[in-house]
């Protein structure tokens, strides 16, 4: 869902002249400024070094639910794949901005009881220690708008069941909610402005809009 919203916003933004999408399957979108690469091995992006060279920003939107996964499998997707991409980008585009989708509740100490929070904390810390402009954004509940939909069935069911809560949460706990279009626009603003704060919650992101 986040990746689809991010792509749509990048294609809409007139200041963004070229968009490269790397995935295992096609996004099935046609646009003059879009280029797509289907890449089977997400643990090795070295063959894409020339494609990444000179990039201004990377919006890393890959994510997976921890439900039903052991820690090793979750770490492979959440941390190992992220760092595999980041290591190539930092070599060929060291002045670029890397914006990583993390999540509210991430544990920066890496020692908490929640497995997913620890692993995301490890990932954030590793990225922030790398010699480029890395940011971690921590959205909570994301309201899908503009036709954006999640591909995860139980997420979709959850959104249908709890969508009515969004206006309430927005008032009582603005830090915990954000719309998909707001998140995407804010991530673009992070890349443009390079704010001093490098870990951003939903309310921090809305302040950039």
Where are each of the predicted segments found?
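N-terminal Rossmann/SDR dinucleotide-binding element
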Residues: 1-64, 183
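Conserved Rossmann-fold NAD(P)-dependent oxidoreductase catalytic core, especially the SDR/UDP-sugar
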Residues: 64, 72, 76-117, 121-122, ...
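Rossmann-fold NAD(P)-dependent oxidoreductase module
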Residues: 5, 9-13, 84, 88, ...
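Short, flexible active-site loop motifs that bind/organize anionic cofactors or intermediates
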Residues: 6, 38, 72, 173, ...
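Conserved short hydrophobic patches within well-ordered secondary structure
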Residues: 7, 11, 16-21, 81, ...
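NAD(P)H-binding glycine-rich loop region in Rossmannoid oxidoreductase-like domains
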Residues: 35-84, 88-90, 107, 191
């Amino acid at each position: 869902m986040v990746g689809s919203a991010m792509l749509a916003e990048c294609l809409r933004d007139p200041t963004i002249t070229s968009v490269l999408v790397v995935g295992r399957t096609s996004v099935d979108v046609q646009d003059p400024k879009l280029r797509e690469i289907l890449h089977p091995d997400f643990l090795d992006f070295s063959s894409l070094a020339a494609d990444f060279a000179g990039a201004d920003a990377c919006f890393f939107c890959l994510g997976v639910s921890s439900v039903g996964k052991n820690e090793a499998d979750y770490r492979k997707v959440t941390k190992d794949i992220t760092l595999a991409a980041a290591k190539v980008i930092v070599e060929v585009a060291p002045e670029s901005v890397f914006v990583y989708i993390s999540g509210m509740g991430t544990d920066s100490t890496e020692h908490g009881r929640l497995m997913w929070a620890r692993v995301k904390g490890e990932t954030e810390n590793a990225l922030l220690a790398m010699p480029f402009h890395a940011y971690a954004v921590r959205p909570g509940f994301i309201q899908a708008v503009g036709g954006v939909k999640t591909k995860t069935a139980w997420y979709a069911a959850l959104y249908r069941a709890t969508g009515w809560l969004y206006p309430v949460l927005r008032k009582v706990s603005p830090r915990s909610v954000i719309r998909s279009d707001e998140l995407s626009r804010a991530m673009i603003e992070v890349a443009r402005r390079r704010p001093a704060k490098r870990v951003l919650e939903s309310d921090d992101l809305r302040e950039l809009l």
